[in-house]
Amino acid sequence: MGTHPVKGRTGFTLAKVCKAHRGNVGELLAAHGLHVGQEMVLVELWESDGLRGGELAVRLGVEPPTITKMLRRLEGCGLVERRPDPSDARSFRVYLTDDGRALEGPVTGCWELSEERLLAGMGEEDRRTFHELLVRVRGNLDSCSAAE
Amino acid sequence: MGTHPVKGRTGFTLAKVCKAHRGNVGELLAAHGLHVGQEMVLVELWESDGLRGGELAVRLGVEPPTITKMLRRLEGCGLVERRPDPSDARSFRVYLTDDGRALEGPVTGCWELSEERLLAGMGEEDRRTFHELLVRVRGNLDSCSAAE
DNA sequence: ACCATTTAGTTAGCCGGCTAACTAAAAGCT
DNA sequence: AGCTTTTAGTTAGCCGGCTAACTAAATGGT
């Protein structure tokens, strides 16, 4: 018996951490009527409003159909607005509404709270190390998916 | 302009790493006809065949309806078999088929390969540190969801 | 013995993801 | 100009997740 060898792998633990973290963030975001994943769209728009749909997909690292559906829902919630791109009739640009802008503070707070839970009991040193390692690992994954 | 502050947070980076990692594993598993997530069910069964549905849900940290649907699909693929539990008429037990058992090697290989990509260019020391930190973080997340 | 309560799974329906196949507009080539 | 190719988004449909509401069997209290 004993546990399966795969369970001891770093990748396996990472997958479990991800799942838990996503659930954690999702729980906090739900209080603001958001589903986990949608906040990523908002972050990009808070950073630069008026992006085109395709640009959003690239920045989120997501396929176009995902953006189509998410925007439909975010628009339905009145957080976002789609306006045609004057310079390209196939395209559109996404703008935050007042409600969408108003979520910046609360959602940022959710991220901060969830991060405090994530790193609870860890010192500055470990936190920095963890962050650095995550950034390196992210670079690995990005470059390997780009190489395809 | 500059990037939004949320993007600099450890939790944000973690979310991105997760997404990329999941995609990475998913790509490898697809070669064996599996969707990412399904392999978790198989891991539990390789470890202890004949689990009840509810027990599977607990081990995967997933809600019962998720198990219902996944098992229906895995059964449809012929990887798994559901037999009634003789001691409880509401319950059933899940058993691997020969095909399900045959996937153990290949799927383990997928995890190993994806882990090599994940940790590429990192030394033993960093790998160990990263693993330890992930385990601690996982403990944090588990305990906070259990406290609810 | 009986009824209320808890427990095990299912169904329906939503959301974030994906791929495949499509439409329509823009860009390029001749 | 006219035709081909590329690009931008959409639709349909699948999968892993979730919640809410339900069925049916086991358990517990009296």
Regions flagged by a language model, labelled:
Chain A
Residues 1-32, 148:
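N-terminal leader segment of winged-helix/HTH proteins
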Residues 22, 72-135, 139:
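Charged, amphipathic alpha-helical coiled-coil/dimerization segments
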Residues 53-54, 65, 72, 92:
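Residues within helix-turn-helix
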